[in-house]
């Protein structure tokens, strides 16, 4: 198999798994940085949630990295200048000079079948037959009913909030999570509404016993509590990061293989949530 065509196949491979038509209209997904002179004989693709300077330096120092797939887009709003003064722009300039492409799939991963929200749903609820999207997409496809933002999980066996908190910790690898328990930790949960990242706009108007997401505003948590709805918050990127290692790595490697490309798909060791609980 070839190792020289990774950067040229990057867009096709990512979009074969995460259809860009699923991305939200406000989002900025796709190939965000196309290096003019791609690295030759580079066989690795680096996955990250956030393309920070530390992650960019990690990619640059590893001469086998040809491309970065950054879940969150490093370019979101229009740029009026690209200078070395701005940390993000500095990273882009360095990556371009080093021949490294950058692709961001973001909300296409959120909405896709077997995307980040299905990973959360299977981790918190188990099984697949009791999971559906909160906001289905309008795509004309056989998977349309399963695609979309957020997930509603109807638990086959009602489970205590205490147990679901433990599942959330195990899934995300966190020692601590934030919990709102208006009915107590031993209250039984039958229906979970979840969304990776900042899920308030998705979960808040759903009929559920528990909201499970990365972050909600203070007033959204108060509103949930007033309605007797429990809440588990793990931090924005903590609800996304584990998906890279558990699912995306294998999916991309398999898709590259189908294209006749022997790609080594790796997860950044420098990518981390910016907040730490002490």
UniProtKB/Swiss-Prot annotation:
<dbReference type="InterPro" id="IPR002678">
    <property type="entry name" value="DUF34/NIF3"/>
</dbReference>
<dbReference type="GO" id="GO:0005737">
    <property type="term" value="C:cytoplasm"/>
</dbReference>
<dbReference type="InterPro" id="IPR036069">
    <property type="entry name" value="DUF34/NIF3_sf"/>
</dbReference>
<dbReference type="GO" id="GO:0005634">
    <property type="term" value="C:nucleus"/>
</dbReference>
<dbReference type="Pfam" id="PF01784">
    <property type="entry name" value="DUF34_NIF3"/>
</dbReference>
<dbReference type="GO" id="GO:0005829">
    <property type="term" value="C:cytosol"/>
</dbReference>
<comment type="similarity">
    <text>Belongs to the GTP cyclohydrolase I type 2/NIF3 family.</text>
</comment>
<protein>
    <recommendedName>
        <fullName>Protein NIF3 homolog</fullName>
    </recommendedName>
</protein>
<dbReference type="GO" id="GO:0005739">
    <property type="term" value="C:mitochondrion"/>
</dbReference>
């Amino acid at each position: 198999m070839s190792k020289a065509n990774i950067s040229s196949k990057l867009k096709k491979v990512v979009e074969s798994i995460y259809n860009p038509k699923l991305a939200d209209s406000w989002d900025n997904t796709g190939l965000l940085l196309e290096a003019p002179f791609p690295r030759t004989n580079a066989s690795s693709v680096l996955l990250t949630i956030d393309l920070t300077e530390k992650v960019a330096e990690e990619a640059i120092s590893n001469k086998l990295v040809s491309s970065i797939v950054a879940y969150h887009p490093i370019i979101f709003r229009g740029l009026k200048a690209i200078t070395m003064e701005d940390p993000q722009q500095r990273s882009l300039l360095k990556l371009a000079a080093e021949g490294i492409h950058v692709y961001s799939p973001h909300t296409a991963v959120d909405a896709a079948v077997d995307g980040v929200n299905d990973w959360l749903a299977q981790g918190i609820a188990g099984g697949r037959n009791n999971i559906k999207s909160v906001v289905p997409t309008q795509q004309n496809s056989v998977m349309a009913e399963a695609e979309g933002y957020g997930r509603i999980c109807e638990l086959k066996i009602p489970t205590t909030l205490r147990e679901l908190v433990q599942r959330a910790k195990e899934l995300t690898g966190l020692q601590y999570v934030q919990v709102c328990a208006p009915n107590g930790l031993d209250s039984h949960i039958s229906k979970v509404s979840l969304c990776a990242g900042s899920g308030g706009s998705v979960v808040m108007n759903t009929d559920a016993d528990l909201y499970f997401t990365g972050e909600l505003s203070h007033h959204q948590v108060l509103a949930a509590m007033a309605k007797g709805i429990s809440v588990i918050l793990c931090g924005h990127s903590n609800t996304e990061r584990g998906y890279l290692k558990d699912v995306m790595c294998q999916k991309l490697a398999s898709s590259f293989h189908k294209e006749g490309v022997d790609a080594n798909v790796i997860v950044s060791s420098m990518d981390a949530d910016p907040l730490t609980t002490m």
